[in-house]
From Swiss-Prot:
Keywords: Cell membrane, Ion channel, Ion transport, Membrane, Metal-binding, Sodium, Transmembrane, Transmembrane helix, Transport
Reactions catalysed: fluoride(in) = fluoride(out)
Protein localization: Cell membrane
Gene name per UniProt: fluC3
BP GO annotations: cellular detoxification of fluoride
Summary of activators and inhibitors of this protein: Na(+) is not transported, but it plays an essential structural role and its presence is essential for fluoride channel function.
Binding site for Na(+): G76, S79
Record protein name field: Fluoride-specific ion channel FluC 3
Transmembrane segments: 3-23, 40-60, 69-89, 101-121
Membrane topology term: Multi-pass membrane protein
Gene source species: Bifidobacterium longum (strain NCC 2705)
Molecular-function GO term, any one: metal ion binding
Family membership: Belongs to the fluoride channel Fluc/FEX (TC 1.A.43) family.
Length: 121
């Protein structure tokens, strides 16, 4: 698997990005408010799954190559913290200060809690 590992990581990154896109479009279809729920939800799921992958790897259930494929590949493509930062800046520019502040605090804190929950599952 060593020779194919970089290729598999890249392919899974593409799959993760595709899943992010589909979930983003689906959530935005039903949620049309100032708070960027789609990005928040995606990062919440990614945080939980990252914690789960870390726990499986630490427990010896998941080998290192598969950890790389799942965490670096799929979750790297799926999570979207750079979009979260951009959305915070956009909210500030539109003078939606309470929403921007809440989004900042929640986007930094909740995925960490989700990762801890995923690790403890």
């Amino acid at each position: 698997m060593t020779v194919f590992l970089p290729i598999l990581v890249c392919l899974c990154g593409g799959v993760g990005a595709s899943c992010r896109y589909l979930l983003d479009v689906t959530i935005k279809t039903y949620w049309q408010r100032a708070f960027p729920l789609s990005t928040f939800t995606i990062n919440l799921i990614a945080g939980f799954l990252a914690g789960l992958v870390a726990a499986l790897a630490l427990g010896g259930t998941l080998d290192e190559p598969w950890r790389l494929v799942l965490a670096t590949g799929f979750l790297g493509g799926f999570s979207t913290f750079s979009t979260a930062i951009n959305e915070m800046v956009t909210l500030f520019r539109k003078h939606r200060y309470p929403t921007a502040a809440a989004y900042l605090v929640l986007s930094l804190g909740v995925p960490v809690v989700a990762a801890a929950c995923g690790f403890l599952v």
